[in-house]
Amino acid sequence: MTGAQLSDTDFERLDPRFGWMRDYLAMVKPPDLLPGRQHVDPHAFGALLAFVNLVDVDRHGEDYRFRFRLVGTHQTIAAGREITGRFLEDAVLPQFVDRIGRNMRLAVDSRQPVYDAFPMPHPGRDFIATERVYFPLARDGSTVDMLLIVNAYPGDVDLNRVLLPPQPSRRPHT
């Protein structure tokens, strides 16, 4: 399932935070369109916000560059450094740039969530196992301009601990 698009069955086998985010985004999105950043209320995430990254998709013709706009506090702690504002190639170890870039491009091009798992891609942090889902966001409902990444750390009970908030009972945006 590495670097793969996800089915409902896949989500059932993964950390519950990934399914929570899938369900939240499905609830807030306009009918038949992708959700955009404007539909996302970070207050609804509760403690899950500490595990969330937002990445800007800078389009250059057929090419993309990815810049970390927001990095959750747990992600910063796990990485052992701050990567907010950095482009992908400056944010992670060189041996992970292609893999993470492929995942991001797949989420952008397919307009579907993408899952991957690998060691933490930061200096001296490869002892931390990570898994993540890249969720596409599109301000216009169609062209992906941002990725919302949810991170989990399956091998570290303390770092991975999160109490998922209840799903809002109504659509916060119409």
Show the residue positions of the predicted features:
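Intrinsically disordered, low-complexity terminal regulatory regions
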Residues: 1-91, 98, 102-174
